[in-house]
A protein has these predicted regions:
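Enzyme catalytic cores with a strong preference for nitrogen-chemistry domains
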Residues: 1-252
Length: 252
């Protein structure tokens, strides 16, 4: 697995079975070009090309990459009122979302086909007057396989995004294996994970740095970290047989 824009972090995933082939996946860590969807899609195409140059077969983009994750924005919303400035900001955000299917979807599909990679793309989907946080799936032949809409937006996300209804929990058979996705906090929801397990979702891949200690908006369970700075005696480990032999020799 490689991480674009962090060149020092590159780990190749190897299956447990010696007979299985190696899959190289790329996690894209990049920002949206806010309120400029064409520029964001241009950037996505460049990143897909860069991932393919690494030899990747699968590229996974961030939540809401096309359309943007508006971290820190409140869109002027308080209980009982919305400011004019906030309304204008939401108008721009709504205009930056994409229709699914639509021209932006076609461009990502074309890039997947051109570089022969599978892509999972985070987008803000516009459906009528509702926005959804959505993951789109593409295979290496450039086919748009389908989508997953985030079921339960977190906290203030519920002001700007609609709720998925459970009808978009796909797992797709592809040439590199079965692909599915959950978005952000959904990975902490046991029933959603169980729904994927029930569809024979072969393997769950989560980054080893998933534990976030810097205050991610969706980690209320992390209240504080306490560090014991007092020196402690070192702990050594040995086999049970060696420990017994040492004890017997001391008793002789």
């Amino acid at each position: 697995m490689s991480v674009i824009n962090v060149p020092e972090v590159e780990v190749e995933m190897r299956p447990a079975s010696p007979n299985a082939r190696t899959l190289r996946a790329t996690v894209v860590q990049a920002s949206t070009v806010f309120y400029d969807t064409p520029a964001t899609v241009d950037k996505a195409e460049r990143l897909i090309a860069e991932g393919a140059a690494y030899g990747s077969q699968l590229l996974v983009f961030p939540e809401g990459f096309i359309g943007g994750y508006p971290r820190g924005s409140n869109f002027g919303a308080v209980v009982g009122n919305r400011s004019f400035k906030g309304r204008e900001e939401f108008r721009k955000y709504y205009a930056s979302a994409i229709d699914v299917p639509g021209p932006e979807v076609e461009r990502i599909a074309a890039a997947a086909a051109k570089y022969k990679v599978h892509v999972i793309m985070g987008v803000i989907e516009r459906a009528g007057f509702t926005l959804y946080c959505t993951a789109l799936f593409f295979d290496s032949q450039g086919r748009f396989l389908g989508k997953h809409r985030k079921m339960m937006p977190t906290a203030l996300e519920r002001v700007i995004w609609g709720f998925g209804d459970g009808s978009t929990l796909p797992v797709y058979d592809t040439t590199i294996g079965r692909l599915g996705a959950l978005i952000c906090w959904e990975n902490r929801m046991p029933l959603l994970r169980t729904a994927l397990y029930a569809k024979d979702f072969g393997e769950i891949v989560r980054a080893k740095f998933d534990f976030d200690v810097v205050g991610h908006y969706a980690r209320p369970d992390v209240l504080k970290l306490t560090v014991n700075d007092h020196p402690l005696n070192p702990v050594t480990f040995s086999s049970g047989t060696a420990a017994l032999e040492k004890k017997d020799s001391e008793n002789v």
